Amino acid sequence: MTESCDSGSLPLQDDVEKFLGGAARFNLYPDDDSVKYFEKKVIESFLDKVEAGIDVPNYPQFRDMSEMFLAMMEGVERVKGGYIEAKIPSVRADRNHIPELMVIKRNSQMIREKTGKPFQVKVCVTGPYTLSSFFIQRDNEIFDRLGNTISQIVENNIFSGKDGSAGLIAVDEPVFGMLDDPLIDYGSEGRENLRKAWEAIFHKVTSKNVQALLHLHNTADELFWEVKSLNIIDSHTDDPVYQMKKTKEQLEATDKFLKASICT
């Protein structure tokens, strides 16, 4: 079981535009100055987390966590007021890996030499429900379409080597449970499609012997308990799930763990 992991990163204090440019050019122009800057900041931040004693640090998250995954999708277009599906979303061939994770993977040997042992990294992706909230038009199958794409991104970014590996995959759903959304009303087709989308993503994770975590900001809607392949539930420190008596019973009944969240 994971001992400790973190969520996100402190804001980048240096040249944000150069960092974002490096992330965008990462696959096409490896010798570009902005790409080298991007790599340097990713490694520095990741090593800071390791040296702080975090067992499974998340890759540095200095970019918008929704836009970065929507940018990895073919068939998705940004328009005034949000996004639209020009065709069924799929993973772009030239952007099928998370640049931050590729930097860490390429520098695995150096990281291991500095830490003195093989390392694990937490891979955070934004979930289909939260991504759907950016679309102007939503139907009850949008969770399935976006979920298939995120599932492929997850599969592409799970790695394991002698120096380091992906030890935890976290699906971030900060919007879930925060809105009154008819698409996921109890008994609706959309609700079942969201459950299936989560199940498909987490099955990809657990089939690789990697732990699967769902990060929420509100657990009032208990759909997540029905996801069989989900190992770990995580929410904000003030979420009632941490104090409710029935939580322990549900954890035991569904064979899941609850991550203890700490604010520092």
Regions found by a protein language model. Name each.
Residues 1-75, 211:
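N-terminal basic, low-complexity leaders that serve as flexible interaction/assembly modules and, when applicable
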Residues 47-51, 104-120, 158-164, 203-207, ...:
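Acidic (Asp/Glu)-rich catalytic clusters
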Residues 62, 126-130, 174-176, 211-221, ...:
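Active-site beta-loop-alpha junctions enriched in small/polar residues
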Residues 62-75, 119-135, 163-190:
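Active-site-proximal loop/short-helix segments
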Residues 74-159:
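Active-site-proximal, glycine-rich beta->alpha crossover segments in alpha/beta enzymes
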Residues 147, 154-157, 165-217, 221-222:
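Loop-centered beta-sheet repeat module
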Residues 231-264:
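Catalytic-face loop-and-helix region of soluble metabolic enzyme cores
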